[in-house]
């Protein structure tokens, strides 16, 4: 697990098991598996609910699924695409500045010229 998150009060493992028959049929008919969308929506709501409750959160992308499954008693065929660390931030903790592309480099409005 990420060392900076080792002091978190709790971790939530967001799991993805085998989808049901109707979900698989829908994925075949549309050519789209909505599992990632659903997990993203779930994770976003989890983070927003935590913030509303006064908790800080960090979505962790780096994880060892095999070790997590063993530690949590989760069948190995179950995917754990996301882990969220939750806890109260340390007094005076400042979020480090992120290095990200500008909105103009990542956002496109249909009908507008590409920059």
Question: How should each PLM-predicted stretch be described?
Answer:
Residues 1-39:
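Glycine/small-residue-rich phosphate/adenosyl-binding loop
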Residues 3-6, 74-76, 99-100:
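Solvent-exposed alpha-helices and their adjacent loops that cap or buttress functional pockets
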Residues 67-81:
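Short, electropositive alpha-helical surface patch
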Residues 54:
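Structured binding elements
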């Amino acid at each position: 697990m990420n060392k900076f998150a080792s002091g978190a009060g709790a971790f939530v493992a967001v799991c993805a098991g085998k989808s049901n028959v109707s979900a698989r049929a829908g994925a075949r008919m549309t050519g789209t598996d909505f599992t990632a969308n659903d997990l993203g929506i779930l994770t976003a709501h989890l983070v927003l609910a935590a913030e509303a409750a006064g908790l800080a959160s960090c979505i962790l992308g780096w994880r060892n699924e095999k070790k997590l499954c063993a530690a949590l008693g989760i069948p190995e065929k179950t995917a754990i695409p996301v882990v969220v660390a939750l806890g109260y931030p340390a007094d005076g903790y400042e979020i480090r500045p992120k290095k990200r592309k500008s909105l103009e480099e990542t956002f496109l409005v249909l009908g507008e010229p590409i920059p």
